[in-house]
Curated annotation (Swiss-Prot):
Lineage per the UniProt record: Eukaryota, Amoebozoa, Evosea, Eumycetozoa, Dictyostelia
UniProt cofactor note: Binds 1 copper ion per subunit.
Protein name per UniProt: Superoxide dismutase [Cu-Zn] 1
Binding site for Cu cation: H46, H48, H63, H120
Biological process, per Gene Ontology: aggregation involved in sorocarp development; removal of superoxide radicals; response to bacterium; response to cadmium ion; response to curcumin; response to hydrogen peroxide; response to oxidative stress; superoxide metabolic process
Stated family: Belongs to the Cu-Zn superoxide dismutase family.
A cellular-component GO term for this protein: phagocytic vesicle
Length: 153
């Protein structure tokens, strides 16, 4: 039985919708995003631990990392569950795209449903930048927009 989820991204200048679909617990999750207001370039795109936006995106906590791993690229074995890499904005129109990820899930104990999706100001260095926060945040910078991931039809 497939599951779907949706997240409405809100920020001062950044807004959008992220949709998640997973056919079954063993299949990858398809992530479709449509976001406006991003400056040209790459922007970190992560699932954060908490579904709390009471203090803006800051209250979403760190990246979703139930296995205590270092930050990494979506293709890395050693990565946070919430590490979805970067999305690329042209700075002129909606930033749209699709990601397929085999680590996040809409099923089970480590579901991303109820957690927060965050779009960051800077490029995620995928844990390889050698900066003090590369292995925790990918040095992706400020949180421009976020929203709680909820169940959808």
């Amino acid at each position: 039985m497939s599951k779907t989820a949706v997240c409405v991204i809100k920020g001062e200048k950044v807004n959008g919708v992220v949709k998640f679909t997973q056919e079954n617990k063993d299949s990858p999750v398809t992530v479709n995003y449509d976001i406006t207001g991003l400056e040209k370039g790459e922007h970190g795109f992560h699932v954060h631990a908490f579904g709390d936006t009471t203090n803006g995106c800051v209250s979403a906590g760190p990246h979703f990392n139930p296995f205590g791993k270092n930050h990494g690229a979506p293709s890395d074995e050693d990565r946070h569950v919430g590490d979805l890499g970067n999305i690329v904005a042209d700075g002129e129109s909606n930033t749209k795209g699709t990601i397929s990820d085999k680590i996040i899930s809409l099923f089970g104990e480590h579901t991303i449903v109820g957690r927060t999706m965050v779009v960051h100001a800077d490029q995620d260095d995928l844990g390889k930048g050698g900066k003090p926060d590369s292995l925790t945040t990918g040095a992706a910078g400020a949180r421009l927009g976020c929203g709680v991931i909820g169940v959808s039809q």
